[in-house]
């Protein structure tokens, strides 16, 4: 694939951060002729050995970023964990150095490829993009959209924040390891969107907004502005009627489709009518048919319908895709039934909004909820109402246990402390009654106690399995 129009050959590019995304950037840029080096503020970046093995020509610099080093580059490529406000980055940008991220490089490459396809003697259709962001539900909606597009007969690549970095996905296609997709379905974080300006998605959504990453953003307005960058193109805007902050992102003159847990205001919007998913006034499918429970998943399904329908795909195929969607790991995932109590892993619930949705999604069932970890500067106040309405008890772990305890103190629900997650499982087992749920939905990041949210889930599931074995022996 020819990217001469991007003028990468010989360009001095410095990649900042050597996680999965940084490594993918270094690899893709090197293949396409850039003079690549990598800098990471950590003394021992996670992929240092892999970089040396697979890209020995790429120099690695470790330790604090130096302004002069960054300013000497033609282009900075920022990993999601490196903010534009990083002083050395800000100084380089002020001196005229371009700063982009992997999604921006992908968007530019895709524009070149689509232009080349259109210029062929027998023009080929452009590859389309569905782009998804939001505080909660991103991965679920992304996976739903991928399944629904496949059910409609399209070749699909799902990538981005959901797992496979976009440039790794593009590299696999360039190497012939995967087919060229008809549609890209991308999950994008606010961190990625900060450095993205050229993405022109066929349909894009900001699913919802609640406090998250307040250790990175000065306020909710800055966080929302980063999310809104997903609408930089000309495609359909998909917005949540139940979230005023996302509705405010509607751009005059753009095609807007909304979704919400109410009746549809117009014929092209999606909503709920008498416990059925509906498009305008047309009933589409009973909510009970969805394999993923809870009203938050009803909202996810409606968003996915709005996004995929924007590609003019047949509604029957999209509904079949929804019916077959079984959910994702660590998103209110059932782990076990023990003595009449159902245990759920929602380790991916890393902010207050996600935990609120998980608790309300329990319906009439009371839950013993395990909360705590690294709160990322969030306001835990909104948890109080959800705890009061749905929790039998709260078990607290991690760095911000004290802050959460203070926020829910007046909820009328007792809270308990645990030193470890296995201890929390034991306490929850004693507190839960038959017919209850035990829900790990921490409302926090995991890095104070675990490698990541997956590691936290593994520890939880292991503890639940041990509990099940012990109860079976009694």
From Swiss-Prot:
<dbReference type="GO" id="GO:0008764">
    <property type="term" value="F:UDP-N-acetylmuramoylalanine-D-glutamate ligase activity"/>
</dbReference>
<dbReference type="GO" id="GO:0009252">
    <property type="term" value="P:peptidoglycan biosynthetic process"/>
</dbReference>
<dbReference type="GO" id="GO:0071555">
    <property type="term" value="P:cell wall organization"/>
</dbReference>
<dbReference type="InterPro" id="IPR004101">
    <property type="entry name" value="Mur_ligase_C"/>
</dbReference>
<dbReference type="InterPro" id="IPR005762">
    <property type="entry name" value="MurD"/>
</dbReference>
<keyword id="KW-0961">Cell wall biogenesis/degradation</keyword>
<protein>
    <recommendedName>
        <fullName>UDP-N-acetylmuramoylalanine--D-glutamate ligase</fullName>
        <ecNumber>6.3.2.9</ecNumber>
    </recommendedName>
</protein>
<dbReference type="GO" id="GO:0005524">
    <property type="term" value="F:ATP binding"/>
</dbReference>
<comment type="function">
    <text>Cell wall formation. Catalyzes the addition of glutamate to the nucleotide precursor UDP-N-acetylmuramoyl-L-alanine (UMA).</text>
</comment>
<dbReference type="Pfam" id="PF02875">
    <property type="entry name" value="Mur_ligase_C"/>
</dbReference>
<dbReference type="InterPro" id="IPR013221">
    <property type="entry name" value="Mur_ligase_cen"/>
</dbReference>
<dbReference type="InterPro" id="IPR036565">
    <property type="entry name" value="Mur-like_cat_sf"/>
</dbReference>
<dbReference type="GO" id="GO:0051301">
    <property type="term" value="P:cell division"/>
</dbReference>
<dbReference type="Pfam" id="PF08245">
    <property type="entry name" value="Mur_ligase_M"/>
</dbReference>
<dbReference type="GO" id="GO:0008360">
    <property type="term" value="P:regulation of cell shape"/>
</dbReference>
<dbReference type="GO" id="GO:0005737">
    <property type="term" value="C:cytoplasm"/>
</dbReference>
<dbReference type="Pfam" id="PF21799">
    <property type="entry name" value="MurD-like_N"/>
</dbReference>
<keyword id="KW-0963">Cytoplasm</keyword>
<feature type="binding site">
    <location>
        <begin position="134"/>
        <end position="140"/>
    </location>
    <ligand>
        <name>ATP</name>
    </ligand>
</feature>
<dbReference type="InterPro" id="IPR036615">
    <property type="entry name" value="Mur_ligase_C_dom_sf"/>
</dbReference>
<keyword id="KW-0131">Cell cycle</keyword>
<comment type="pathway">
    <text>Cell wall biogenesis; peptidoglycan biosynthesis.</text>
</comment>
<keyword id="KW-0132">Cell division</keyword>
<keyword id="KW-0133">Cell shape</keyword>
<keyword id="KW-0067">ATP-binding</keyword>
<keyword id="KW-0436">Ligase</keyword>
<comment type="similarity">
    <text>Belongs to the MurCDEF family.</text>
</comment>
<keyword id="KW-0547">Nucleotide-binding</keyword>
<keyword id="KW-0573">Peptidoglycan synthesis</keyword>
């Amino acid at each position: 694939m020819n990217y001469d129009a991007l003028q990468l050959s010989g360009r001095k590019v410095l990649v900042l951060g050597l996680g999965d995304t940084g490594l993918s950037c270094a690899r893709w840029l090197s293949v396409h002729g850039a003079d690549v080096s990598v800098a990471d503020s950590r003394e021992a970046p996670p992929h240092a050995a892999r970089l040396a093995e697979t890209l020995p020509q790429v120099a690695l610099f470790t330790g604090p970023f130096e302004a002069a080093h960054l300013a000497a580059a033609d282009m900075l490529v920022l990993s999601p964990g490196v903010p534009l406000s990083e002083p050395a980055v800000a100084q380089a940008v002020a001196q005229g150095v371009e700063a982009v991220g992997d999604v921006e490089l992908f968007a530019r490459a895709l524009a070149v490829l689509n232009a080349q396809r259109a210029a062929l003697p027998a023009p080929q259709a452009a590859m389309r993009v569905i782009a998804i962001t939001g505080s909660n539900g991103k991965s679920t909606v992304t996976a739903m959209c991928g399944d629904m597009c496949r059910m409609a007969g399209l070749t699909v690549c799902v990538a981005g924040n959901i797992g496979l970095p976009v440039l790794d996905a593009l590299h696999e296609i360039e190497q012939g390891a995967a087919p060229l997709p008809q549609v890209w379905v991308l999950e994008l974080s606010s961190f990625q969107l900060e450095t993205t300006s050229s993405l022109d998605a066929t349909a894009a959504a900001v699913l919802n907004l609640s406090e998250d990453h307040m250790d990175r953003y000065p306020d909710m307005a800055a966080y929302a502005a980063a999310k809104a960058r997903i609408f930089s193109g000309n495609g359909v805007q998909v917005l949540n009627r139940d979230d005023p902050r996302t509705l405010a992102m509607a751009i005059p003159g753009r095609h807007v489709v909304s979704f919400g847990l109410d009746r549809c205001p117009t014929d092209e919007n999606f909503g709920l009518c008498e416990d059925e998913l509906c498009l305008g006034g047309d009933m589409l499918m009973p909510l009970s048919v969805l394999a993923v429970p809870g009203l938050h998943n009803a909202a996810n399904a409606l968003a996915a319908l709005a996004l995929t329908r924007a590609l003019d795909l047949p509604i029957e195929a999209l509904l079949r895709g929804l019916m077959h969607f079984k959910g994702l790991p660590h998103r209110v995932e059932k782990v076990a039934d023990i003595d009449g109590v159902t245990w759920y892993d929602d380790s991916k619930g890393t902010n207050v909004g996600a935990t609120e949705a998980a608790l309300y999604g329990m319906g009439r069932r009371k839950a013993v909820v395990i909360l705590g970890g690294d709160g990322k500067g969030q306001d835990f106040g909104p948890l109080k109402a959800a705890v009061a309405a749905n929790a039998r008890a709260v078990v607290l772990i991690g760095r911000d246990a004290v802050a959460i305890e203070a926020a829910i103190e007046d909820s009328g629900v007792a809270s308990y402390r645990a030193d470890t997650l296995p201890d929390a499982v034991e306490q929850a087992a004693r507190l839960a009654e038959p017919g209850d749920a035990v829900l790990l939905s921490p409302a926090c990041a995991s890095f104070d106690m675990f490698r990541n949210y997956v590691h936290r889930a593994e520890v939880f599931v292991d503890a639940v399995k041990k509990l099940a074995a012990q109860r079976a022996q009694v």
